[in-house]
Each structure stands twice: as C-alpha cells, then as structure tokens.
Curated annotation (Swiss-Prot):
UniProt: [4Fe-4S] cluster binding residues: C562, C571
Designated name of the protein: Photosystem I P700 chlorophyll a apoprotein A1
Record localization: Plastid, Chloroplast thylakoid membrane
Cofactor binding description: P700 is a chlorophyll a/chlorophyll a' dimer, A0 is one or more chlorophyll a, A1 is one or both phylloquinones and FX is a shared 4Fe-4S iron-sulfur center.
Catalytic activity field: reduced [plastocyanin] + hnu + oxidized [2Fe-2S]-[ferredoxin] = oxidized [plastocyanin] + reduced [2Fe-2S]-[ferredoxin]
Binding annotation for chlorophyll a': H664
Record's subunit section: The PsaA/B heterodimer binds the P700 chlorophyll special pair and subsequent electron acceptors. PSI consists of a core antenna complex that captures photons, and an electron transfer chain that converts photonic excitation into a charge separation. The eukaryotic PSI reaction center is composed of at least 11 subunits.
E.C. number: 1.97.1.12
Record GO terms (molecular function): 4 iron, 4 sulfur cluster binding; chlorophyll binding; metal ion binding; oxidoreductase activity
Length: 719
C-alpha cells in the first residue's frame, strides 16, 4: 500500500497559532527578530522535522498550493481581458490598436494615465503578450475569456482541495516519492506527452481554422465558435481539405495527406509576423510522439526498460573513478539535490526561451509589438537568472544538510570536491582574463575616440574584430533549408541571415541580424559577467561544508554571519552569502544582456519600411558604431532612452516615469540596508526605545535590529 490514511489532523486552532511548525517560534515573540524568523522558517521544512517522508508530503502539498495560486493569477489575467480590455477591437485591427487590459480609476486626476490606445479605448498599454497568445489559441470574444477565468478559479479550488487531501486525508508514503522510474514514465508520457498531444489537438481542430479566417480578414464576430468546428467536419474541410479523408491516411501510413495542416515551412507568416501556426501544430504533435515514447522507457512492473540506478552506476569513464555511483541514493533522499539539478536545467531552458521569443516569435502580431517583445525577453531572462542562482542555493543546502561524505568515495562528486581548489583558481583566472580584456577593449576605444583617432579604434570601419564563428553558425543555418527537410521553405529563424525581411503593416517584424565588432565586444562582457556569477556560486557550493579558513563550516549551517567571536575576518563566508553575492552578479549579467538586446533590436531590426522599400530603424542603425565605447553606451543608449521617461510627466506615459523614479527609490532603499552595519541600527533603536520608556509607551516585544543575514536579505531583495 502506497498511501497512509488520515496521517495529520486538520486543526484550524493549530494553524491559527503563529509559528506552530517550530517549538521555538510557537512560544511567541520576545524580540522583533521573531517575526523575521517566522518568515525565514515557515517553508524551511527541514527545520520542522527530520522525517523525510513528512518533508516529502509537505513539499507535495505545497506544490498544489503553488498551482492554485498560478490558477488564481491566470484567472485574474483572463478576467481583466474579459472585463477591462479592448481585446475584440485589437483582434479586428491588431496593427493599429494597441493592447490594453487595465484602466486607471479617475481619482484626483489619475485618468491622465489612460492614453488613447486606439479603437476608441482609453487605458494603459499592456506588454504581457496575452492578446497575441489568445489570438493564437483561437479566442475570438470576451465571453470565452470570462469562461476561462471562471474555469481557472474552479481549478484553483480543486488544487487547494488536493493539497489538503494529500497531506491530511491520503498522504503518499516515502516509497511513492522515491519510485523514480514510475515518476519518469508518468511525467514524460502524461504531463509532457499527453499535454502536448492535447494542445496539438486544440490547435488543429480550433486554433488553425479560426486563425486562417482571421488572417483572411473575416470579422471576429463572423468566425464560427470552437464547438462548431469540433462538431461539424464540413467547416473544417473548407479550411483544410484533408479532413474529408478522416483517419484513413493515418492508419494507411499515408501521412503526407495531412500536410495541409501539419507543415514544415520555416520562417514567418507574412500576414501576422508570427510562426506558421501549422508549423507549431506539427511541432507539438511531434513532441507528443517523442514524449509518449519516452514515457515507456523506464522499468517498472514488467521487468523491461531502463533502470535509473543502473544507468547512473554504469556512467563511468577511464578517468572518473567510480563515476556516478552513489548519485541514485543522493537524488532519492535529498530533494535539495534534485531541485538544484532541475533549477539549473529549467533556468537554462528559460533563457533559451527568451531568445526564441524574438528569433522565432510564436504568436500572431507579437513580433511587431516591440514593447511586448522587450518585456517578454526581459521577463524570461530574469526568471532564468533567478532559477540558475536558485540551483546553486539548493546545491549548497544539499552539501550542508544532506551530503554524507562517508558514502561518497571516489565518485565524480567526491572527485570534484577534492580538486575544488584547482577548479576555483582556474575559474578565477578566467574571470580576471575576461574582465581585463573585454573591458580593456572598450577603454582602448574610449581613449582613441577622445584623442580623435577613430582609425585606431576596434570597430567595423577601423580595426575589425569580427565574430567569425558566430557568423559561420548563422550562415550554416541560413543555408540549411535547401539541403535538409524536403518541404522546408525557409530557415528556422529569419534572423540567421539571407535577404528575407517580414513586415506587417509597414512595421518590421523580423530581419537578418548581422553580427559585427560591436557584438564581439559586448559578447565578451557577457562572458565575463556570467563567469563571475558562476565563480561565486560554484565556490559557494564547493566550499559549503569546509574550507581552510573554516574547516568545520558544515556545523555552522547554510547561513551564518561569522565564525563566532574572536575570529575576525570570517564574516560573510556562509553558503547563503555566496548566493547573496551571486545574485548581484546575476543582476549585472542580465542588465548587460537586456541593454544589448534592446539597443541591437532598435538599431538593426525594429523600425518601419516604406512602400518603396526604404527602411527606417528606430535608432537609425547606430549600434555598430556607438556601442564600441563606454561613452557611447552612456550617451546614445542609456541617456537617449531614459530621457523620454524622465520627461514623461504630464502625459499618459507618466506612469512609466513614476515607476522609473520608484524603482530608483527602492534601489536606494536597498543600499541603506547594505551600507550601514548592524550595530548602527541597534544603537539607534536603543535610543528610540529609551524615549518610549520615558513616555511609558514601550512595546512588550523588545525591538531588535535585523541580523546581518536578515539585513542583507532585505537589501538584495530591493536591489
């Protein structure tokens, strides 16, 4: 039996007691530190109990809670689309009407923020990409958005119920959580395989015919509703004739009959500037097949298929000792180790997604909505950055809390830890090399520019440093369609090269992105900042348990301020502090990436094209020359772009000016926590408490300055 019935009583009285999960915190506050510890430890299930089964159940229950919150959030997005948006007006004229789903109430003149977005609608322009996603899904009216919003709330309720049910009524036993083969099969075949198949089915039966009609200029009110396509095959055959043949071509393996709705064209739809939706339907069907096969690969009840333990233990090379022996035990008993790997993979994938959003814009009219393109790129870069740093955080927690050196001898993990000095010192050298050389190229250019010697600068018009390997990769992909798949008419992305340019309503959706000296320079800044981030995070993981400075670090835990009194120079060495510093460098990395993307696209891709074919880019193609100096970045990018926001007061853009101001206030607030020491605040607090005592209004809970760790946490959060 894999389920335990009624393991934990449902008690509202217990839940109402703050800190009920911890013996110490349940006693209540003596100082204000209590409230911070409450926040820090509420979800640190390791600190509640040592029982791995109970910890696993809590994590499992929390996942349902997380899903419920996501459903509520999604419901809100869809509800705004239904109640406060100009979706239907946008749908009928997406090139002139801007998307808006937020209206500011007219309290003391705030209606100035509601600009005219077109279609007779006043509101704040949104940049989330939901309109484009809804159009691609085949949503044609606001009632459908209402229904989806209600459906999402119902699902949120189900998720909350499931979270309670699987912790309090029928909780899985530890063996269920550790049955990795079954979990792999179900997640691969069910979640990814059937999930992709369901989406492919929706695309084929609902989205494709609706989008085909919309592309042809049919009014959204005239388009048949989704159920009409599903119930009436005649309407479908008008859009895609092969539907008349039913499933006969499928079972006779004559699959090419379906090539009217399952295509492999490449490039973009010239009407919408998005990927061909017939390509994406084909893609999801193919992905579904792959994952359905993958979901039958692992050995469970019938003695056939792969065993994860066998794969890991066989994974050893001539120079790697015991290889991955012992890793199976780690990954089935340490959820931190499991999470670290998943976060690293998902973080990398999210960053890849951010690049696909502009190189292969997946939804109709997304590529010509520049503000949304910028927002989606930024969003996915940031999320990816957080996930990668989170991977290092949980890897370090694993090292401190879950790693048992006695069971890991001479396997890959042990060997990496034993030669950590070589790894970190080499990585440090790489960072120094990249930092001095990449920055040095810019300093050289600034100096030559200041001295009036443009011929001695590194640029496309003087001393060229062309990214030849990147150009070779681009060229290979640009030439691929002719020699790879039979029906591929264009490259996977038109950014690779060639002469194709897609414009929608005179606005450029995509064009080849040529790389030159300016990109070569900033690329090495990317390499530098990313390597420094990795250096800090990896050092935190590899030295989480011990170092020459603090040999017994593992005993001090994941986060600690210093190695006790009398040991000066041992502050800020905990694994937590490495995550803290790693976050700052992750921010550094992403800032440069977003600057590069934003300027490059405005300079070389985005803009307008006249009927005569004359192209006008937003910043007039100034990236290649201006971005080769630090001064160019400051003057022609940062100031040139920020000045519009700073001067936006009194117009409907002032919301962005206020956000810009507010963001800088939040940032300055963070520095207050990072630049002043704990003792400063403790001294100040005690003086204020003295004054309260004089007036006999002193609180029972003794006020106390934030600990060093807490102060830095507040600081990094607001940075």
């Amino acid at each position: 039996d894999i389920v335990e019935k009624d393991p934990v009583k449902t008690s509202f009285e217990r839940w109402a007691q703050p800190g009920h999960f911890s013996k110490n915190l349940a006693k209540g506050p003596s100082t204000t530190t209590w409230i911070w510890n409450l926040h820090a430890d509420a979800h640190d299930f390791d600190s509640h109990t040592n029982d791995l089964e109970d910890i696993s159940r809590k994590i499992f229950g929390a996942h349902f809670g997380q899903l419920a919150i996501i459903f509520i959030w999604l419901s809100g997005m869809y509800f705004h689309g239904a109640r406060f948006s100009n979706y239907e007006a946008w749908l009928n004229d997406p090139t002139h009407v801007k998307p808006s789903a937020q209206v500011v109430w007219p309290i003391v003149g705030q209606e100035i923020l509601n600009g005219d977005v077109g279609g007779g609608f006043q509101g704040i322009q949104i940049t989330s990409g939901f309109f484009q996603l809804w159009r691609a899904s085949g949503i044609t009216n606001e009632l459908q958005l209402y229904c989806t919003a209600v459906g999402a709330l119902i699902f949120a309720g189900l998720m909350f119920f499931a979270g309670w049910f699987h912790y309090h009524k029928a909780a899985p036993k530890l063996a269920w959580f550790q049955n990795v083969e079954s979990m792999l099969n179900h997640h691969l075949a069910g979640l990814l395989g059937l999930g992709s198949l369901g989406w492919a089915g929706h695309q084929i039966h609902v989205s494709l015919p609706i989008n085909q009609l919309l592309d042809a200029g049919v009014d959204s009110k005239e388009v048949p509703l989704p159920h009409e396509f599903i119930l009436n095959r005649e309407i479908l055959t008008q859009a895609y004739p092969s539907f008349a043949k039913g499933l006969i071509p499928f079972f006779t393996l004559d699959w090419s009959e379906y090539s009217d709705f399952l295509t492999f064209r490449g490039g973009l739809n010239p009407v919408t500037g998005g990927l061909w939706l017939t390509d994406t339907a084909h893609h999801h069907l193919a992905i579904a097949v792959l994952f359905l096969v993958a979901g039958h690969m692992y050995r469970t009840n019938w003695g056939i298929g792969h065993s994860t333990r066998e794969i890991l233990e066989a994974h050893k090379g001539p120079f790697t000792g015991e290889g991955h022996k012992g890793l199976y035990e780690i990954l089935t008993s340490s959820w931190h180790a499991q999470l670290a790997i998943n976060l690293a993979m998902l973080g990398s994938l999210t960053i890849i997604v951010s690049h696909h959003m502009y190189a292969m814009p997946p939804y109709p009219y997304l590529a010509t909505d520049y503000a949304t393109q910028l927002s989606l790129f930024t969003h996915h870069m940031w999320i990816g950055g957080f996930l990668v740093v989170g991977a290092a955080a949980h890897a370090a927690i694993f090292m401190v809390r879950d790693y048992d050196p006695t069971t890991q001898y001479n396997n890959l993990l042990d060997r990496v830890i034993r030669h950590r000095d070589a790894i970190i010192s080499h990585l440090n050298w790489v960072c120094i090399f990249l930092g001095f050389h990449s920055f040095g190229l810019y300093i050289h250019n600034d100096t030559m520019s200041a001295l009036g010697r443009p011929q001695d600068m590194f640029s496309d018009t003087a001393i060229q440093l062309q990214p030849i390997f990147a150009q070779w990769v681009q060229n290979t992909h640009a030439l691929a369609p002719g020699s790879t798949a039979p029906n591929a008419a264009a490259a996977t992305s038109l950014t690779w090269g060639g002469s194709n340019l897609v414009a929608v309503g005179g606005k450029i959706a995509i064009s080849p992105i040529t790389l030159g000296t300016a990109d070569f320079l900033v690329h090495h800044i990317h390499a530098f900042t990313i390597h420094v981030t990795v250096l800090i995070l990896l050092k935190g993981v590899l030295f989480a348990r011990s170092s020459r400075l603090i040999p017994d670090k593992a005993n001090l835990g994941f986060r600690f301020p210093c190695d006790g009194p009398g040991r000066g120079g041992t502050c800020q060495v905990s694994a937590w502090d490495h995550v803290f510093l790693g976050l700052f460098w992750m921010y550094n990395s992403i800032s440069v990436v977003i600057f590069h993307f934003s300027w490059k696209m405005q300079s070389d891709v985005w803009g307008s094209i006249s009927e005569q074919g004359v192209i006008n880019h937003i910043t007039g193609g100034n990236f290649a020359q201006s971005s080769t100096t630090i001064n160019g970045w400051l003057r022609d990018f940062l100031w040139a772009q920020a000045s519009q926001v700073i001067q936006s007061y009194g117009s409907s853009l002032s919301a962005y000016g206020l956000l810009f101001l507010g963001a800088h206030f939040v940032w300055a607030f963070s520095l207050m926590f990072l630049f002043s020491g704990r003792g400063y605040w403790q001294e100040l607090i005690e003086s204020i408490v003295w004054a309260h005592n004089k007036l006999k209004v002193a609180p029972v809970t003794q006020p106390r300055a934030l600990s060093i760790i807490q102060g830095r946490a507040v600081g990094v959060t607001h940075t």
